């Protein structure tokens, strides 16, 4: 007879006891070495769908265990495979309970922790991890939630329309899906950070799904911090709203650090555009991704990323939308990601961005690079500043206010060549004032009086503009000389160009001379 031992992933010493303070509770496995057959079902019901009340101190159906423990020991249990005859030794928990069994409250650190245990087995009906979905029966507040290696079964935390408040951090460190939230009537609040350590994989089967298939709102007081290459889905299904009243708010930064992690905004299809606000995006890995869920059922998702930066941030990954379904490669997806800049600082998106949705700048500074061959939807400038990195391309554009920046990067300054903006359709000037062209204080000494014209914007057609470009554009933050603008015919439309000189062009010079004359006359009267 063969004997095989399955060792725990995080090695506690054999028969070690892990005891917790009165303010720390473990969710208890309901089906340890037990009543499930090889299908993983009890009375025909999958063991992760046996609803267990999160706030109950009582024993759950099919279990001799209470829901919450203050600690556990680990012991060996042998089980024999009926077909092969092989005996396997599993490491399983033996839980410890307080004299008065309790349930979590606002002072409790909640642990879904299975990293000391062995994996289950289909062949002999042994399963243990997070059997039975956690179910809320009322609005609930806890101090923190820690999810650690709940890998054998998905963790299904069903909120059933009740609100869940976590005063401090949420930590996800697991291989399998962990889902929190199950109703659009639920509001989830996290006072601290969401730390995502995850599995090291990017499959939808390895994702942390905060919001489940869509809750009413998600508010995170801190940031989302990726500490490994992993995947997270942030999902709301709230009522119709606008960018400055988003269904999801992450007050801090979504920090990808150096990891090729993935953040999905939205899961499962919904007709209502959902707004996901962040205090900024940060990350140095060009393979990091912000997108939507990519399952067949998500087709048609419209998710809008709102950037509410209060400090400058740079994200080198890409913002994209999936084009084919992960669960059926023949299904073409029409999901859309939009971007709104509504902050007080600068957000740089320097990756291969190819999202198909619109871009709106309300306030703050947005610097955007478009992937080669890609184009976004409509660019709308209502305020703040927009600038390209290399090139930014759009289906159309409308200017109501704000400035357009050039010489936005060290590369452009080193080459002394401004970035370009491509508008494949109409460029509409709806605002009445001049469009400020912000040159970011670049030293144009070598460009002055060199007789060269530099392309800035190319548009298929123009609307609301004067015949003379200098009537519609004005240079700001130019360290030396003067800028002159002109429209010329391009390959597919009109091209806005700029040239730099040591003296203003005649019309501007005449206007300046006239102002000086008026000033002199006014002084003479006094």
Model-found features: residue ranges?
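Bacterial N-terminal signal peptides that target proteins for export
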Residues: 1-10, 506-507
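Bacterial N-terminal signal peptides
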Residues: 9-17, 517
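Extracellular repeat-rich scaffold modules on cell surfaces
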Residues: 27-47, 158-250, 286-380, 428-432, ...
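Solvent-exposed adhesion/ligand-recognition segments of exported proteins
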Residues: 21-172, 308, 442-502
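Extracellular beta-strand/loop-rich repeat segments of large surface/secreted proteins
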Residues: 303-304, 311, 338-339, 368-453
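Glycine-centered positions in the ABC transporter ATPase nucleotide-binding domain
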Residues: 261, 345, 364-366, 384, ...
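A short, hydrophobic C-terminal helix/tail in secreted or cell-surface proteins
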Residues: 505-522
């Amino acid at each position: 007879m063969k004997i095989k031992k399955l060792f725990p992933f995080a090695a506690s010493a054999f028969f070690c006891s892990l005891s917790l303070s009165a303010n720390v509770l473990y969710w208890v496995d309901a089906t340890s070495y037990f009543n499930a057959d090889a299908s993983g079902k009890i009375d025909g019901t999958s063991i992760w769908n046996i609803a267990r009340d999160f706030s109950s101190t009582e024993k759950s159906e099919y279990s001799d265990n209470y829901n919450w423990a203050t600690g556990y020991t680990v012991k060996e249990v042998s089980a024999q495979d009926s077909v092969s005859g092989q005996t396997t030794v599993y490491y399983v928990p033996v839980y410890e309970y307080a004299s008065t069994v309790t349930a979590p409250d606002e002072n409790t650190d909640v642990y879904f922790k299975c990293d000391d245990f062995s994996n289950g087995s289909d062949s002999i009906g042994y399963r243990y991890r997070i059997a039975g979905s956690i179910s809320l029966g009322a609005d609930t507040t806890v101090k923190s939630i820690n999810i650690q290696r709940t890998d054998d079964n998905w963790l299904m935390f069903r909120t059933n329309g009740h609100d869940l408040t976590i005063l401090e951090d949420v930590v996800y460190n697991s291989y399998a899906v962990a889902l929190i939230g199950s109703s659009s009537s639920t509001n989830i609040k996290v006072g601290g950070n969401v730390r995502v350590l995850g599995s090291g994989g990017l499959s939808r089967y390895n994702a942390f799904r905060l919001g489940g298939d869509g809750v009413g709102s998600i508010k995170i007081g801190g940031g989302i911090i990726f500490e490994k290459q992993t995947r997270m889905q942030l999902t709301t299904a709230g009522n119709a709203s606008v960018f400055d009243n988003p269904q999801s708010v992450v007050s801090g930064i979504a920090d990808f650090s150096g990891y090729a992690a993935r953040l999905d905004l939205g899961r499962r299809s919904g007709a209502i555009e959902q707004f996901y606000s962040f205090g900024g995006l940060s990350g140095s890995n060009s393979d990091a991704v912000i997108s939507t869920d990519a399952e067949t059922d998500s087709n048609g998702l419209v998710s809008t990323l709102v950037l509410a930066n209060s400090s400058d941030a740079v994200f080198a990954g890409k913002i994209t939308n999936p084009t084919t379904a992960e669960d059926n490669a023949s299904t073409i997806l029409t999901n859309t990601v939009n971007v709104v800049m509504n902050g007080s600082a600068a957000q740089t998106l320097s990756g291969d961005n190819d999202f198909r949705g619109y871009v709106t700048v309300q306030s703050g500074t947005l610097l955007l690079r478009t992937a080669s061959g890609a184009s976004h939807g409509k660019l709308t400038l209502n305020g703040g500043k927009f600038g390209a990195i290399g090139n930014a391309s759009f289906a159309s554009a409308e200017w109501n206010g704000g400035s357009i920046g050039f010489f936005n990067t060290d590369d452009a300054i080193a080459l002394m060549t401004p970035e370009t903006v491509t508008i494949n359709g109409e460029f509409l000037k709806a605002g009445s004032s001049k469009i400020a062209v912000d040159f970011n204080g670049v030293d144009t000494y070598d460009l002055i009086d060199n007789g060269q014209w530099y392309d800035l914007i190319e548009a298929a057609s123009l609307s609301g503009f004067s015949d003379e470009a200098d009537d519609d554009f004005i240079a700001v933050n130019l360290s030396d000389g003067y800028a002159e603008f002109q429209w010329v015919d391009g390959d597919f439309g009109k091209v806005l160009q700029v040239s730099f000189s040591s003296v203003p062009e005649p019309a501007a010079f005449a206007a300046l001379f006239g102002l000086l004359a008026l000033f002199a006359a006014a002084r003479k009267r006094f």
